[in-house]
Regions:
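Flexible coil/turn and secondary-structure edge motifs
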Residues: 1-236
């Protein structure tokens, strides 16, 4: 319930989806079409340029771990915000850049980030800053495209995230005593976490879990990894 969302258009959504999914605090990313003039458009209809949809990714994130300002700042690293209806080699109104929101409070942050980004350019930023009118998921084959096709087309430079390092303050996650852990954990959890034993494969309650979220240390609660990093053929991860 505490997760927030924003919709970002930055050219071909394959690369934008994969890029945003790598940011710490992002739980899920899906590709789709935003702010067009018909229901349930197909990729071919969007590509025609007649529906006014923008290829867009829906970003679901935890504001306790990454701020909207940070997300947008990282987003601006990989787009040309002064280019109209074009990103990289992709040309057409479906490839325009945009930031779309539902919460009016988010617009304050978006305005702030755009104003700061404008200082870097002599040309006026043309990135849209609009309420989300509609959003439709793209076809299944577009989801996680670069994960399924590592050598597929991408206009995004992933090295732009090289300085996005995560640090965990371990002091915030003290280890309880064994007595406390025995009272808190199940027998299997205690055996694995404290006594260094192993559990039978695929018996853990999270083995087939498909919900977006953050996996934490059962002993201390320290963050370990995001559901984005969990791989499963049956689960589409952002």
């Amino acid at each position: 319930s505490k997760l927030k969302e924003v919709w970002l258009a930055g050219g071909c959504f394959w690369g934008v989806e994969a890029y945003m999914a790598r940011i710490y605090g992002v739980y899920d990313v899906t590709s789709g079409y935003a702010n067009g003039n018909k229901d349930n458009p197909t990729y071919e209809e969007v590509s025609s340029g007649k529906t006014n949809f923008a290829e867009t990714v829906h970003v679901l994130y935890d504001p306790d771990r990454v701020s909207l300002e940070t997300l947008l700042t990282d987003f601006f690293k990989v787009i040309d915000p002064t280019s109209q209806n074009r990103q990289g080699n992709d040309v057409g109104n479906q490839y325009r850049s945009g930031i779309y929101y539902k919460n009016e409070k988010d617009k304050i942050v978006i305005d702030k980030v755009i104003k700061k980004q404008q200082e870097k350019y002599t040309s006026k930023i043309s990135t849209e800053n609009l309420p989300l009118k509609n959003f439709f998921l793209a076809e299944k084959y577009h989801q996680d495209y670069l994960e399924k096709n590592p050598n597929g087309y991408c206009h995004i430079d992933f090295s732009k995230l090289s300085d996005n390092k995560v640090t965990i303050d371990v002091k915030k996650y003290p280890r309880p005593s064994n007595e406390e852990l025995k009272a808190k954990l199940t027998a299997v959890q205690y055996s694995v976490a404290v006594e260094n034993n192993t559990e039978k494969a695929f018996t853990n309650e999270y083995a087939s879990n498909v919900a977006a979220g953050l996996y934490v240390d059962v002993v201390t609660g320290e963050p370990l990894f995001s559901s984005i990093d969990k791989r499963s053929e049956e689960r589409r991860v952002g």
